[in-house]
């Protein structure tokens, strides 16, 4: 009986524990859900605050832009045609001109007004968000004073039209008009008191000053004296505003001093450069420039499409005209560059999101839009864009935007190339991801044709358009080459062992791409020389041609020759290595250390007696003349037929030397090496040879390579230039992780 009770007790405890565990799991799930909701709400709050702050600061930059644009004009010079050409042409232009011309501003008043606009703009741009909202509440209060003034003037006019010298409120109908006007004034007073947050009785009593004509009329004020009551109300309002400003001035001065101290503290803590960067981020200058330019651009589009009645068939020219009319000062030029940067960055991020690549840019200038923004600024400054007329701006801007599109297509190709070439070796990649990447690559094939077609329809053919067309053709050829290499790699992944001819196909595709690049560059050079002969010599054209010859022809030709030499040397060397037969491979039952696929039918034996697939080793040796496992430098003397002998002898030598390497792994440099080894094929002239430092430098490089790790897989993924430009940090991290795992 006691045993049964113990079993029942144990069962109850287990049930209780399960119940508690389920409860704890439920609580943990609820806690995680609440945390995720809090994180989402925080992000939404931050985004809302950013949008609100940027929108509230927008008038400051607009005021400075308009002041800069019309700083050379006087008020009398403003004409009806000039106002109709502005983005505000959908307002009542005659009324605005009549208002401006009747003010009779003199020069001193214009200067005071200009400095006041600058002061207000700086307040919009620099005040904290809480103070900025407070500032808007004051402006809204002034607007409500204007509404109260208008209602008071309407009331006086209505009373003058009635013709009643003496007011008799002997009925509810007669009281109705006066009561509604008085109620409207009280509602405005309540709103003003809420906005100004007045906390004293005298201030509240002074607010309903425009109700004075209503009270005076209801108290029996003669009709001819009613305008005097309205004038008294206006005078009282002005006195109230002046008194309020004097009362709030010490607080404004104190806030200004506090802000200056905070700015000084930022520069003292962070230094000059970092301090400017901190203030730049705090004031959200980039977002503000983008928002300002987009706002002005949309206003211009509204004028062109709605006010001027242009059709949607002219949308291309309308867009270019809108950008040209919007960009008139250095401020809007910077805003245009920042907007271009954001658009290019968003397109690059969207491409990475679609293809499943990482969204980290790696470097601050990599696919972040800064290159396109700097290109816009440099080209506009070089050509004097801001001083041109709208028609000239439109043509030049079309050229600049096509250059930006060409640079953007090149950035997108760099993104899709890495992703598409890594997809065949990724077993977890879904078919949808493969399809998305192929679609992006096909778009890079088609889009350059459309950009070239539209550019030729808008712009004449010159050296700039020739360079853009050549870049478009290069991007198309590269995209086609990447698609072909992707197909070849897919075929290779379906085979049991690496395909012997796959490296040849990849090599021919790369050679074809490089040939097309060189051909396009030479065509541009010939066209540029013809332009110089036909049109005449200019320093800008000569500088462009010189840069084009150095970068696009000489450097590409040098890289192509080096690529072909390295590949031919790798093929020559791999053919001189001995082959392992099927019996040896079955006895070893080993995998290739490069591709990690079992070696069944074909393998090559290095001079240090390591086995690899022939295609894998050829790819490796085309980049680095070292053994992938032990990083022993392989010289020309090592690739001879004498190293091959019978299978048994190879096995014995391989086992003996493998044991020797295991016994003395710390001193691999003690292996015999020819003192006067010839330079590996494909190496360029080295100035160290002139001073006899080559042997010492090679020893140092081999030691560093052994330290950085023997399982460096980068040569299989990137070309020679990319490998040499890459830092060794990635390989060091890989070695550290493998040592920790071992």
Curated annotation (Swiss-Prot):
The chain crosses the membrane at residues 109-129, 138-158, 178-198, 233-253, 285-305, 318-338, 368-388, 395-415, 438-458, 463-483, 533-553. It is found in: Membrane; Golgi apparatus, cis-Golgi network; Golgi apparatus, trans-Golgi network. It is an enzyme of class 2 (transferase). A zinc finger (RING-type) spans 592-630. Its EC number is 2.3.2.27. SUPFAM superfamilies: RING/U-box (SSF57850). It comes from the Eukaryota. Keywords: Golgi apparatus, Membrane, Metal-binding, Transferase, Transmembrane, Transmembrane helix, Zinc, Zinc-finger. This is RING finger protein 145 homolog. It comes from Caenorhabditis elegans.
């Amino acid at each position: 009986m006691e045993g049964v009770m113990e079993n029942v007790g144990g069962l109850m405890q287990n049930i209780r524990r399960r119940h508690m565990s389920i409860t704890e799991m439920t609580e943990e799930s609820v806690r995680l859900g609440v945390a995720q909701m809090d994180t989402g709400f925080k992000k939404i709050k931050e985004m809302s605050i950013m949008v609100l702050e940027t929108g509230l600061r927008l008038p400051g930059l607009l005021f400075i832009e308009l002041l800069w644009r019309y700083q050379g004009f006087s008020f009398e010079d403003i004409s009806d045609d000039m106002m109709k050409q502005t983005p505000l042409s959908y307002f009542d232009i005659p009324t605005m001109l009549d208002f401006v011309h009747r003010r009779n501003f003199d020069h001193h008043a214009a200067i005071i007004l200009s400095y006041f606009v600058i002061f207000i703009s700086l307040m919009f741009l620099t005040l904290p968000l809480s103070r900025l909202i407070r500032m808007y509440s004051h402006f809204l209060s002034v607007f409500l004073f204007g509404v109260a003034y208008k209602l008071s003037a309407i009331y006086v006019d209505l009373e003058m039209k009635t013709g009643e010298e003496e007011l008799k409120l002997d009925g509810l109908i007669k009281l109705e008009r006066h009561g509604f006007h008085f109620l409207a004034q009280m509602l405005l007073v309540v709103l003003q008191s809420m906005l100004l947050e007045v906390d004293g009785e005298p201030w509240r009593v002074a607010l309903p000053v425009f109700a004075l004509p209503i009270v005076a009329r209801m108290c029996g004020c003669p009709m001819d004296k009613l305008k005097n009551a309205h004038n008294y109300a206006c005078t009282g309002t002005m006195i109230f505003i002046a008194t309020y400003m004097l009362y709030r001035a010490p607080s404004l001065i104190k806030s200004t001093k506090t802000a200056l101290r905070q700015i000084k503290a930022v520069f003292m803590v962070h230094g000059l450069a970092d301090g400017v960067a901190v203030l730049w981020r705090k004031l959200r200058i980039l977002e503000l420039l983008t928002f300002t330019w987009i706002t002005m651009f949309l206003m211009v589009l509204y004028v062109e499409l709605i006010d001027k009645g242009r059709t949607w068939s002219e949308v291309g020219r309308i867009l270019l005209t809108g950008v040209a009319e919007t960009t008139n000062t250095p401020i809007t030029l910077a805003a245009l560059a920042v907007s271009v940067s954001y658009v290019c960055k968003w397109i690059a991020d969207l491409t990475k999101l679609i293809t499943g690549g990482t969204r980290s840019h790696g470097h601050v200038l990599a696919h972040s839009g800064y290159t396109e923004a700097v290109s816009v600024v440099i080209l506009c400054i070089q050509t004097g864009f801001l001083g041109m007329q709208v028609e000239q701006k439109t043509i030049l801007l079309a050229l600049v935007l096509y250059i930006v599109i060409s640079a953007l297509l090149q950035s997108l190709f760099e993104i899709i190339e890495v992703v598409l070439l890594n997809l065949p070796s990724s077993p977890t990649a879904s078919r949808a991801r493969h399809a998305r990447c192929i679609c992006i690559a096909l778009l890079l094939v088609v889009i350059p044709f459309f950009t070239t077609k539209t550019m030729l329809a808008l712009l004449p053919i010159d050296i700039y358009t020739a360079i853009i067309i050549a870049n478009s053709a290069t991007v198309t050829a590269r995209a086609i080459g990447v698609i072909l290499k992707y197909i070849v790699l897919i075929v290779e992944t379906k085979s049991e062992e690496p395909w012997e001819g796959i490296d040849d196909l990849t090599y021919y595709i790369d050679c074809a791409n490089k040939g097309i690049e060189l051909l396009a560059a030479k065509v541009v050079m010939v066209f540029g020389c013809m332009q110089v002969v036909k049109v005449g010599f200019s320093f800008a054209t000569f500088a462009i041609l010189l840069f084009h010859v150095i970068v696009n022809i000489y450097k590409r030709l040098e890289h192509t020759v080096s690529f072909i030499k390295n590949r031919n040397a790798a093929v020559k060397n791999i053919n001189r290595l001995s082959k392992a037969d099927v019996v040896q491979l079955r006895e070893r039952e080993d995998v290739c250390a490069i591709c990690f696929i079992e070696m069944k039918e074909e393998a090559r034996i290095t001079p240090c007696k390591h086995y690899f697939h022939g295609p894998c080793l050829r790819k490796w040796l085309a980049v680095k003349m070292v053994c992938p496992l032990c990083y022993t430098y392989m010289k020309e003397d090592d690739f001879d037929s004498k190293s091959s002998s019978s299978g048994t002898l190879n096995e014995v030598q391989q086992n003996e030397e493998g044991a020797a390497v295991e016994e003395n792994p710390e001193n691999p440099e003690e292996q015999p090496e020819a003192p006067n080894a010839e330079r590996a094929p494909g190496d360029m002239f080295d100035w160290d040879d002139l001073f006899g430092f080559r042997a010492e430098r090679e020893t140092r490089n081999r030691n560093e390579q052994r330290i950085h790790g023997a399982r460096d897989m980068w040569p299989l993924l990137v070309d020679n230039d990319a490998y040499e430009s890459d830092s060794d940090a990635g390989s060091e991290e890989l070695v550290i992780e493998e040592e920790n795992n071992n």
